[in-house]
């Protein structure tokens, strides 16, 4: 066993966060999400980090299949997933991520199964994002102080929901040119 803060992980095997692209179109946890993470726990993984979960389903998804936890509607699905992992003794966390300027921003703030890959002209290292073709020419802007504060609140509320769902920890995704990494220099 190993301790991380006040969480005792049964072993040093950790499943790092990945987007398995199986949530419902609205970002809700699917049965496939639950089975996938349950199987990792059944196989003996000590710590499982559920990846690519957005605190902002309207503007903070990079694909149509990202998980979302921006309101209480999502808590029961996440609770079922946490319980499935805990049943086998695993500890579990949720990776909160917002793609920032790389977000898929389709019309009317809703992703659909008709979304497709488009180029990101402002990023050589991140060539595609899944979004409606109409968004290929979207513009980005510097966030205002009010927008910054609103995003901090969204992350805080999402972390609270993760805790309410029974997860043991939260990971903040600060890599790959996503929102949090855009503040690092």
Language-model regions, residue ranges each:
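N-terminal capping/small domains of soluble enzymes
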Residues: 1-99, 106-108, 140, 151, ...
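A generic, residue-level signal for flexible/boundary positions that often mark functional hotspots
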Residues: 3, 134-137, 178
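Aromatic side chains
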Residues: 36-37, 155, 167, 178, ...
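Short, well-ordered beta-to-alpha junction loops that form the rim of enzyme active sites
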Residues: 52-53, 95-98, 167-177
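Short acidic/His/Gly/Ser-rich catalytic and metal-binding motifs that mark active-site loops
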Residues: 57-60, 104-105, 130, 178-183
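Non-globular sequence segments
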Residues: 83-86, 97-167
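Polysaccharide-binding and catalytic clefts of secreted carbohydrate-active enzymes
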Residues: 142-143, 171-185
């Amino acid at each position: 066993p190993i301790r991380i803060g006040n969480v005792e992980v049964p072993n040093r095997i950790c499943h790092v966060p990945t987007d398995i692209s199986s949530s419902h179109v609205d970002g809700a946890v699917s049965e496939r999400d639950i089975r996938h993470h349950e199987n990792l726990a059944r196989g003996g993984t000590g710590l499982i980090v559920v990846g690519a979960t957005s605190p902002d389903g309207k503007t903070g998804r990079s694909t149509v299949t990202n998980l979302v936890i921006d309101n209480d509607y999502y808590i029961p699905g996440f609770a079922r997933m946490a319980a499935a992992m805990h049943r086998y003794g695993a500890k579990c966390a949720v990776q909160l991520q917002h793609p920032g300027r790389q977000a898929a921003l389709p019309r009317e703030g809703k992703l659909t199964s008709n979304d497709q890959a488009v180029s990101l002209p402002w990023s050589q290292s991140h060539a595609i994002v899944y979004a409606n073709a109409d968004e290929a020419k979207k513009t980005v802007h510097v966030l205002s102080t009010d927008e910054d504060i609103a995003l901090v609140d969204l992350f805080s509320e999402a972390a609270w929901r993760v805790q309410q769902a029974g997860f043991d920890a939260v990971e903040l995704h600060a890599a790959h040119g996503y929102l949090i990494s855009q503040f690092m220099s």
